[in-house]
Design a protein with these regions (language model features):
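Transmembrane-helix signature of 12-pass secondary carriers
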Residues: 2-223, 251-448
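Short intracellular "coupling" helices and adjacent cytoplasmic loop segments at the cytosolic face
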Residues: 225-235, 249
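Generic hydrophobic, helix-prone segments enriched in Leu/Val/Ile
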Residues: 230-231, 242, 337
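Short amphipathic alpha-helical segments embedded in low-complexity Lys/Glu-rich regions
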Residues: 68, 235-243
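Flexible, disordered linker segments and immediate boundary regions flanking tandem C2H2 zinc-finger modules
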Residues: 233-237, 424-426
Length: 448
């Protein structure tokens, strides 16, 4: 009965806001700039490295450090972002990520030695990690139910779009052998600055506000997101759904037959321990919430303390879903797509693309444009991914995509083995002394 009632409320809300899609889409696109920055950083370093290794005389080991340092920093930024977004809000964390990325792009653009370049990559990596954790959550929590699936996938589309734009930027500035790499790396600060300015006026996640007992602010946020057609009763229904979803997590946990120390300690928490002293304004909010069947500020705080990773691992349903989701993400990274994207220009160069061209600028331009083509193929297929996922079974799509990746990696590995075994290097033209060659020819003719 309750499920049917919620379904009817969902349909009512969805019909009301079906014409108010502009604001959610705009907010999602501005949020997905975080994904765009991740994709841009992934793609831009491929072409920039062609100039960086010559400008700074980089060894292969140092090139790998420059590429991987941002990923290491992102791995640090992700868990930090998860904690911060729960305590200070999704919006603030996204703003912080924009500031970090903007600073990192500026540092890379004005780098004068290898250490400053490495520092810029480190800062950018932190921004990527912070954004990668907070942006998808924010998009999911501000999206209307009937649009949530499509809007969440926009973040992935923006990642691949960032890779395409990075390839085009690389191709445009590759001819500038002195400062081209500065433009490539520094331009990434433009979309991050746009996101920074735009997010100052963006609404906070309504779900986060409800979770923290700020239901009045959640009402205002919903009104801004869904538009004027979203009337008061429907706003209350939406907030009630959020509250029920949060309470479902609590009920699922308490239904588990566990009695460990963590649960006992939480069970002994008195409501007064959750109330912050000096916050007298919360009591009027508590009264309004109780009248509407919503949790008080103190109840929300206690409820929020239960929504931790440890407790997710203790629940069978959430634990299984968490392991499956994290496992799929892990294998997605291990299949090697990042290696191809980060080193696509290097791979094409090693394969001999443009190797017979004595014009170095023309050779590099050809390599970078082909690298952009690889990124465009990735972007093109990501556009069709939402339709494919909604049309075919998820497991079938996963099997087909993994099979394609496996075959592609096999072809790539075999190709490099054949090039190494049966071909001469064609991407490097050895310099020769024309005068010495002439002397040798003259000497040979004289002896004859």
């Amino acid at each position: 009965m309750a499920t049917r009632l919620i379904d009817r409320e969902d349909n009512l809300v969805d019909r009301t806001i079906c014409h108010s899609w502009v604001c959610p889409v705009v907010i999602t696109c501005l949020s997905a700039l975080g994904g765009f920055l991740f994709g841009y950083d992934t793609g831009v370093i491929s072409g920039a490295m062609i100039q960086l290794r010559e400008h700074f005389n980089l060894s292969y080991a140092y090139q790998e450090i420059i590429v991987s340092i941002s990923l290491l920093a992102a791995a640090i930024g992700c868990p930090v972002s998860a904690v911060l977004s729960d305590y200070i809000g999704r919006k603030i964390v996204i703003i912080i990520a924009s500031v970090i990325f903007t600073i990192g792009a500026i540092v890379m653009g004005v780098s004068y030695d290898k250490i400053s370049l490495l520092t810029g990559r480190l800062i950018v990596g932190l921004g990527i990690g912070v954004a990668s954790m907070s942006v998808p959550v924010y998009i999911a929590e501000i999206s209307p139910g009937h649009m949530r699936g499509a809007l969440v996938t926009l973040n992935t589309v923006f990642i691949t779009a960032g890779q395409v734009v990075a390839g085009i930027v690389d191709a445009i500035f590759i001819s500038d052998e002195v400062n081209g790499w500065r433009y490539m790396l520094g331009i990434g600060g433009i979309p991050s600055f746009i996101q920074l300015v735009a997010f100052i006026n963006m609404p906070e996640s309504p779900r986060w506000l409800v979770q923290h007992g700020q239901t009045q602010k959640a009402r205002v946020a919903l009104q801004r997101i869904y538009g004027e057609s979203f009337v008061t009763i429907q706003i209350e229904n939406e907030i009630q759904r959020m509250v029920e979803a949060l309470r479902d997590v609590e009920l699922s946990e308490t239904s588990q037959a566990t009695s460990d120390v963590v649960q006992n300690s939480n069970a002994n928490i008195d409501e007064e321990d959750c109330i912050l002293p000096g916050k007298t304004s919360q009591f009027s909010e508590d009264a309004r919430n109780r009248d509407n069947g919503l949790p008080s500020v103190s109840e929300s705080s206690c409820l929020r303390s239960k929504l931790t990773l440890i407790r997710m691992l203790r629940l069978k349903t959430t634990r299984r879903a968490l392991f499956i989701g994290c496992g799929l993400q892990m294998f997605q990274q291990f299949v090697g797509i990042n290696t191809v994207m980060y080193y696509s220009a290097e791979i094409l160069s090693m394969a001999g693309i443009g190797g017979m061209n004595n014009n170095k600028k023309g050779e590099n331009a050809k390599i970078v444009w082909l690298s952009a083509l690889v990124a465009f193929a990735n972007f093109l297929f990501s556009l069709g991914a939402p339709w494919i996922v909604n049309t075919f079974k998820r497991r079938l799509v996963l099997y087909c995509s993994l099979t394609g990746v496996f075959l592609s990696l096999v072809v790539l590995a075999v190709s490099f083995q054949l090039i190494t075994s049966y071909s001469i290097p064609v991407s490097v033209v050895e310099s020769t002394n024309v005068t010495a060659v002439g002397v040798n020819i003259h000497t040979s003719c004289s002896k004859a």
